[in-house]
Amino acid sequence: MILFPAIDLKGGQCVRLKLGDMQQATVYNTDPAAQAKSFEEQGFEWLHVVDLDGAFAGHSANGDAVEAILKATKNPVQLGGGIRTLDHIEAWLARGLRRVILGTVAVRNPDLVIEACRKFPGHVAVGIDAKGGKVAVEGWAEASELGVIELAQKFEGAGVSAIIYTDIDRDGILAGINWASTLALAGAVSIPVIASGGLASLDDVRRMLEPDARKLEGAISGRALYDGRIDPRQALALIKASRAKETA
């Protein structure tokens, strides 16, 4: 299990939203590159980055900040928000990004996702953002009629490296992960699932390490880390102990 610290970018700054609302953004750091380096120094293995402005605009809007992050950390970075074309994907991977996250385009043009997986094997994830059980698109601004599992199953066998599942109704309010919907998704597909939205405490980390959650690749934490509700040392120690137990 991997704990992914999150950097959400708005106007070149690290922010966290409440319930996906761009008007409810709290600035946590004005230097995203320094934040990325700090997460690496704390012992995290990956970094999850979202270009919030890009998600709404449909193209990269915080490119300079993302490039600074890539230069500042040796950790692999996954990026979502505004990545809509094969050219976008190729350009970011060429700059050192480990994995792109395709969200809106996965709904609008699933064939592009399949082609991206063929062209860039191991480097493409799908982001599924849900509100009321339905998939949301365009930076969470629009709701679709598509169900979460219905969308995920479209990519079985395509080579998608992970599904990042965000419960918008839990995001940024420290309400705890929606375990029912998250585990239902993980049980419905063979693609590894990463939980996002609501991770609130060490109890949530412990819950992820229980046997029925083993299908999860990991979880993303934002506000709980920034607010000090999750101690990185304790969380990473729990994960390390769990891995040791699995390999013993």
From Swiss-Prot:
Keywords: Amino-acid biosynthesis, Cytoplasm, Histidine biosynthesis, Isomerase. Pathway: Amino-acid biosynthesis; L-histidine biosynthesis; L-histidine from 5-phospho-alpha-D-ribose 1-diphosphate: step 4/9. SUPFAM superfamilies: Ribulose-phoshate binding barrel (SSF51366). Coiled coil: none annotated. InterPro entries: Aldolase_TIM, His_biosynth, HisA_bact_arch, Isoase_HisA-like, Isoase_HisA-like_bact, Rhodanese-like_dom, RibuloseP-bd_barrel. Its EC number is 5.3.1.16. One of its GO terms (molecular function) is 1-(5-phosphoribosyl)-5-[(5-phosphoribosylamino)methylideneamino]imidazole-4-carboxamide isomerase activity. Transmembrane segments: none annotated. Its main location: cytoplasm. It catalyses: 1-(5-phospho-beta-D-ribosyl)-5-[(5-phospho-beta-D-ribosylamino)methylideneamino]imidazole-4-carboxamide = 5-[(5-phospho-1-deoxy-D-ribulos-1-ylimino)methylamino]-1-(5-phospho-beta-D-ribosyl)imidazole-4-carboxamide. Belongs to the HisA/HisF family. This is 1-(5-phosphoribosyl)-5-[(5-phosphoribosylamino)methylideneamino] imidazole-4-carboxamide isomerase. The gene is hisA.
